[in-house]
Amino acid sequence: MRVQVYWNLHKMCWSVVALEGEDKGRVIDYVNYFAITNATLVVQPAGQARVRLEGKKNVHAFVRGEVESLGWTREQHRGWRRIRYNPYRDACFMQDLMPDEWVDGIPVLPVNWAARVDLEPGAIAWAYKAEWR
């Protein structure tokens, strides 16, 4: 099932929105842990501009893809990267790099797709095989 997931600042958990089926467009669950495969990391520019203009957050960034798991299942693999998004600083999701991977002293790279994204409490997200497409 295709969904999009975002960090809910009011409930302090992940909100899961159905992208297909009879509940399309509706929040179908609130979870602490979630895994998505074939994940697209989306930032809507108009929503981001509004955040910067008004100084208060709105839902405009999310992870979209196929449901993998509602529970904690992340296996430790080489290649997992922490990903994050700051609407006041970044135009897209960014992946943290190890010091030996920095490019011109920059510790992050943009990312908009990953083979899998695991979401944890506290708005923490991990991506496996993350890249810019």
Q: Language-model segments: which ranges?
A:
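Structural detector for short beta-strands of small beta-barrel domains
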Residues: 1-8
